[in-house]
């Protein structure tokens, strides 16, 4: 995507990122801070989140706070408590990037282990839904809120062996579409499909692939910025590809 955002694109915006400790989420958190946002980091690993907050500060960004939430074990009550804690420090949320995700096993359907299947659904769908429910009141306080989910190519077209992960991403697309209709005119809701990107998850999914052939998280940030800022103000109910035209599957 060719997009040259204004340096102050996200000034006065408060943006929460899940899975902010690593990979694409870490890069998104750093990038949002560079464009002026006050960033709230959510994840399950305190040391990694603290390191991201420190980097934001070292780069001259606004001080960011981090909060621990393990999507694998979270309950609706834990999500409500998190929203409550956030509301003590912040008046509203202008953006939420649901980025945290779990891959599970890349094996045929008849070999998908039910406990791994349930973990993938819990992190990618159920936990993400519970957190969304808890954060909606804060998002609705913004006059230009943007709620962004993270999908995948296998969330739009099923592919052999992608099992629970693919099914969870179809569910993510559905959740986005339902919410986009329900909050039409109040909150925009979209998905990003990052496309193959050089992260730990990608290396686990394609261990034989040469990572150098992949875009880095930094390369795909233009779309992440565009969807959080006012340049995409009227867009809702859509899945956007961060790498349009890229053929899904292993990079040759
Ligand atoms: P990584 O594995 O590099 O990072 C995943 C992030 O999610 C980490 O911050 C991780 O935390 C966090 N996370 C995982 N499980 C939990 C949990 N139970 N509770 C809270 N946080 C959790 O993945 P990517 O950066 O590659 O992926 C980011 C998103 O993009 C995912 O939704 C993925 O499905 C999607 N995606 C990625 C593609 C790619 O090629 N990379 C392609 C298509 C979609 P921790 O640091 O503690 O492990």
Feature map (PLM): residue ranges:
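Substrate-binding pocket helix/loop in short-chain dehydrogenase/reductase
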Residues: 82, 107-109, 113-119
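C-terminal helical subdomain
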Residues: 185, 191-194, 199, 208-250
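Rossmann-fold cofactor-recognition segment
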Residues: 59-74
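Conserved glycine-rich Rossmann-like NAD(P)H-binding loop of the short-chain dehydrogenase/reductase
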Residues: 37-52
């Amino acid at each position: 995507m060719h997009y040259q955002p204004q340096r102050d694109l996200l000034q006065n915006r408060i943006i929460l990122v899940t899975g902010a400790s690593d990979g694409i989420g870490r890069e998104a958190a750093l990038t949002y801070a560079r464009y002026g946002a006050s960033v709230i980091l959510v994840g399950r690993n305190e040391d990694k989140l603290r390191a991201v907050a420190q980097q934001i500060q070292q780069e001259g960004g606004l001080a960011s706070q981090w909060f621990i939430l393990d999507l694998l074990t979270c309950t609706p009550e834990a999500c409500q408590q998190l929203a409550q804690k956030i509301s003590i420090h912040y008046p509203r949320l202008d953006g939420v990037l649901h980025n945290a995700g779990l891959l599970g096993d890349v094996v045929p359907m008849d070999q998908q282990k039910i406990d791994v299947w349930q973990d993938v659904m819990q992190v990618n769908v159920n936990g993400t839904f519970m957190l969304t429910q808890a954060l909606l009141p804060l998002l609705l306080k913004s006059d230009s809120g943007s709620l962004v989910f993270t999908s995948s190519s296998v969330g739009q077209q099923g592919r052999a062996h992608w099992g629970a992960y693919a099914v969870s991403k179809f569910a993510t697309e559905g959740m986005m579409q339902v919410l986009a209709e329900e909050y039409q005119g109040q909150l925009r809701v979209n998905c990003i499909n990052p496309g193959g990107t050089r992260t730990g998850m990608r290396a686990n999914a394609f261990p034989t692939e040469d990572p150098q052939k992949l875009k880095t998280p930094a390369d795909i940030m233009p779309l992440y910025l565009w969807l959080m800022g006012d340049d995409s103000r009227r867009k809702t109910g859509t899945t956007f590809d961060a790498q349009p035209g890229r053929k899904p599957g292993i990079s040759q």
